[in-house]
Amino acid sequence: MAATGEALTPQGYIQHHLTNLHVGEGFWTWHIDSLFFSVGLGVLFLWIFRSVGKKATSGVPGKLQCFIEMIVEFVDNSVKESFHGRNALIAPLALTIFVWVFMMNFMDMLPVDWLPWLASLAGVPYLKVVPTTDVNITFSLAIGVFVLIIYYSIKVKGVSGFVKELTLQPFNHKAMIPVNLLLETVTLIAKPISLALRLFGNLYAGELIFILIALMYGTNLLLSSLGVTLQLGWLIFHILVITLQAFIFMMLTIVYLSMAHEDH
């Protein structure tokens, strides 16, 4: 339902749920809802982990502390297995990426109409609540990782070592420098693009399926009953999807940064 209260066609309903609340035009468009939920969930993550860390005890831990410790241990083991350099930033970065991306993905588990309906009561016409269904958010995360890849590649190998890596691999001959540069540049640029589009594509598709299922509730009793079954089944399966996508984003970040620390 739109903020005006007018009924929407199926096409209009889908378009409404896939439209961001935004200001500005063209390149300078700001997606207010994506920024609000991504920053808000990031602050929530920091607050929860900081609170648990301050109250952590060596005695019998509470349920929340046990859960947080399990996540931290899981991420720490993943870093130890995949990162072969020495860098105190990698484990905290991996933890932040995994939990933050998971929390943004988890917003997809909320019924598609709840928060947009509440927003419409306040006169807000559009509201997308899943930040990772916005390609701008996923590319922002991926570009942040890409900057770290370039930074540590130059820091560990030096400018000359980084240039040699781009120009003398995989074919170690001066005549092949243009070919090497082309191949390595494409490989380097493909890293953030694949990170961003993989996360965006999976979450966008998942959100679209939830929206299509929600359309079934406005038809007849038979389709509405089928919609309940489909939504429950997709909800259960989607828990795996959102967790797996957060894990993949984290692991690829660890692997890419590990490669940046390898001095050939």
From Swiss-Prot:
One of its GO terms (cellular component) is proton-transporting ATP synthase complex. Its main location: membrane. It is a multi-pass membrane protein. GO terms for biological process: proton motive force-driven plasma membrane ATP synthesis. Gene3D superfamilies: ATP synthase, F0 complex, subunit A (1.20.120.220). The keyword Zinc does not apply. CDD domains: ATP-synt_Fo_a_6. The chain crosses the membrane at residues 29-49, 87-107, 134-154, 177-197, 208-228, 235-255. Keywords: ATP synthesis, Cell inner membrane, Cell membrane, CF(0), Hydrogen ion transport, Ion transport, Membrane, Transmembrane, Transmembrane helix, Transport. It is found in: Cell inner membrane. Pfam families: ATP-synt_A. One of its GO terms (molecular function) is proton-transporting ATP synthase activity, rotational mechanism. Belongs to the ATPase A chain family. HAMAP family: ATP_synth_a_bact. F-type ATPases have 2 components, CF(1) - the catalytic core - and CF(0) - the membrane proton channel. CF(1) has five subunits: alpha(3), beta(3), gamma(1), delta(1), epsilon(1). CF(0) has three main subunits: a(1), b(2) and c(9-12). The alpha and beta chains form an alternating ring which encloses part of the gamma chain. CF(1) is attached to CF(0) by a central stalk formed by the gamma and epsilon chains, while a peripheral stalk is formed by the delta and b chains. NCBIfam families: ATP_synt_6_or_A, PRK05815.1-1. Key component of the proton channel; it plays a direct role in the translocation of protons across the membrane. This is ATP synthase subunit a.
